[in-house]
Curated annotation (Swiss-Prot), chain A:
One of its GO terms (molecular function) is ribonuclease P activity. This is Ribonuclease P protein component 2. Belongs to the eukaryotic/archaeal RNase P protein component 2 family. HAMAP family: RNase_P_2. It is found in: Cytoplasm. The gene is rnp2.
């Protein structure tokens, strides 16, 4: 099949967002559904279809979503209202918008490797400890259906 | 530009510690955060202002609670019906009126708007329901905010925008707040004014009195 000439193609924009917390591995398809629901909830089916949105990358705590040019504000608003994906509480922090994926990839920082810490017991619940940059510590409840999250800093752990 | 965010609880009531919420607020473009804590603090470059939230149906109880206020506390009164709002807004020491979107449409009317403007009492725009409500309930909140915006443009009472976050996952950046406020027709300049208006509300200017 002959590809569509460049002038006939839809102009696209890409939006980079950080996924908070960054450890759950979320599938692109699940992310797409969550964003699609947010867009439909805010703007309806008609406007949602005009956005031509898609998730082109998800991993390392980042997400790159695509939309048609001129609708990146709508996509960023929809990303701001997503609070849960596949039963996990998350937040998307929009960082940048660009015309190319390459430009956004340059803005993605590699996650800093931290020495692993032992599991911690808080109020009778055992948490997995994830140490992040700037002394931030994320605690995630251990178990298959873990839901409980705690967001602390090193100082809070020392005070305990 | 000194942007202020309002949050409602930190660890152990919420899932994020005070330090973590303050750090997150700094990363999201705020330099002051209001939290129901006992003492003011500065963490990194972000100032923490202590707040007290009064939630009652009786004006008498609000007056009693205002008497127990510590200096430097931001007094936030949760809105009730029309008579409650009209009774509370003129009280000295009330800084912010929150939760107007939870009340009936006529609870905050043009009389309350004029009173709020005269007494320099801020009316809060809580972004939390926009994130967590869906469908008809979110539409109702958006309608209330659009109504408030109309009154604000007419009577010019202070607007204070806040995420009212209970966790770092509920906190939003200045840019995201601008986008969310655009949902009910707020302009970017109005959002910036709403994020920077708290110092003006806290330092209420009293009428000039001639002392002989």
């Amino acid at each position: 099949m002959k590809p569509r000439p460049p002038t006939m193609r839809i102009k696209k924009r890409y939006v980079l967002a950080a996924i908070v917390p960054n450890y759950p591995s979320i599938d692109s398809k699940v992310l797409y559904v969550a964003i699609a629901e947010a867009i439909t909830g805010l703007y309806g089916d008609g406007a949602g279809a005009a956005l031509h949105h898609a998730v082109v990358f998800a991993g390392d705590g980042y997400l790159i979503a695509r939309c048609s040019r001129g609708s990146e504000q709508f996509l960023a608003t929809a990303l701001a209202v997503v609070t849960e994906v596949d039963g996990q509480r998350v937040a998307f922090r929009t960082l940048a918008t660009s015309g190319t994926i390459h430009a956004l990839r340059r803005r993605m920082r590699q996650p800093v490797e931290r020495p692993e810490r032992e599991d911690l017991e808080v109020d009778g619940v055992i948490y997995e400890v994830h140490v992040r940059e700037s002394q931030k510590v994320d605690l995630i409840e251990k178990g298959c259906n873990s839901q409980k999250l705690l967001f602390l800093v090193e100082q809070d752990l020392q005070e305990r | 530009m000194h942007c202020t965010d309002i949050c409602t609880c930190s660890y152990p009531a919420g899932d994020s510690s005070l330090t973590r919420m303050t750090m997150e607020a700094g990363a999201l473009g705020f330099d002051t955060i209001v939290l129901p804590v006992e003492q003011p603090a500065v963490i990194g470059n972000v100032s923490v202002l202590p707040a007290r939230v009064i939630e009652t149906r009786h004006v008498r109880e609000v007056i009693r609670d205002l008497g127990r206020t510590k200096e430097g506390q931001v007094m936030i009164v949760m809105a009730g019906d029309a008579s409650f709002i009209r009774g509370v807004v003129p009280l000295r020491g009330v800084h912010l009126l929150a939760g107007v979107e939870r009340q009936r449409k006529n609870a905050f009317d043009h009389v309350s708007a004029r009173l709020a403007a005269e007494k320099n009492v801020g009316v809060t725009i809580d972004l939390f329901p926009l994130l967590y409500l869906k469908g008809l309930q979110r539409q109702r909140v958006l309608q209330r905010y659009a109504d408030l915006l109309t009154l604000h443009r007419r009577y010019e009472f202070p607007f204070v925008i806040g995420s009212f976050a209970r966790s770092i996952l509920d906190q939003r950046s200045v840019r995201e707040m601008t986008l969310l406020c655009a949902l009910f027709g707020m302009e970017k300049e109005e959002v910036i004014r709403g994020l920077t208006s708290l110092p003006g509300v806290l330092h209420q200017l009293l009428p000039v009195r001639v002392v002989e």
